[in-house]
Amino acid sequence: AHGALEASLRSVTSGHSGVALFVDPNLITTAYVTQALESISTGVVSGVFTDIHENPCEADVLAAAAFLAPLNADCVVAIGGGSTIDTAKMALLLAFGGGVPKDWWPVHRHDPVDAPRLYVYPATAGTGSEVQSHALISDDKTHRKMAIGHERLAPTEAILDVSLLASCPRRVMVLAGIDALSHALESAVTRTATDVSTAAAMDAFALIWPALVELASQDRILTAPACEQLHAGEHSGRRQDAGRCIGLQSAPVIIERIG
């Protein structure tokens, strides 16, 4: 629902003694996010990481892991787009699983990682990272993309609050929508696709196309198509992850608060 961030943050952080926050630097100064963060109980937040870069590389996530490791956090919260969420995911995996990114790629490892719960609040509509057990980062030298997968990268909950999209530039929203379309296409044509995943990918196409067309034709973000694109981005993200990871036992709990 609109304005779900503040109440949701209070709920997911209650009962925790150390909350690590990963927040998009463009969001941390907005009144909406600032007010929500201030609502968290005093003394609960262990640290706030805002050194988020678009399309994070190995050095970026190693820095994030170095931030997280000494905090003794029992809860991790990410507020932002796909880059923020992927940075938080990799920080969690490296801080609690050890090693460097290439230790976890390209083989999809299944060794247990005892890590805190991860709650994510996507601020763009299309990356699908909020519902995937993968994080996409770049090689420092070659810039090659690495899709690192592990069951602990699947968020515990993804909370969809359309109010977070208000600060997102329309161009970014449109590009995120195109990203979501590409996820649906990948899901439909992958060799591991099933009848169910293909049908769901087509549903994602049907959801996102009219919303994307409307967003692209306007000079501002409209609530209705933004909601549809947020929903479709999450939907196609799940299908893309299913195509990559048939047989994974864990899946995130999704709270679809759209309306």
Where are these regions (language model features)?
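Active-site segments that bind and position negatively charged phosphate/pyrophosphate groups
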Residues: 187-259
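N-terminal loops that bind phosphate or other acidic moieties
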Residues: 70, 91, 108
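Buried hydrophobic positions in well-ordered alpha/beta secondary-structure cores of metabolic enzymes
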Residues: 21, 57, 82, 122, ...
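Glycine/serine-rich anion-binding loops at beta->alpha junctions
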Residues: 73-89, 123-129, 244
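Electropositive phosphate-/nucleotide-binding environments in soluble metabolic enzymes
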Residues: 2-3, 30, 34, 58, ...
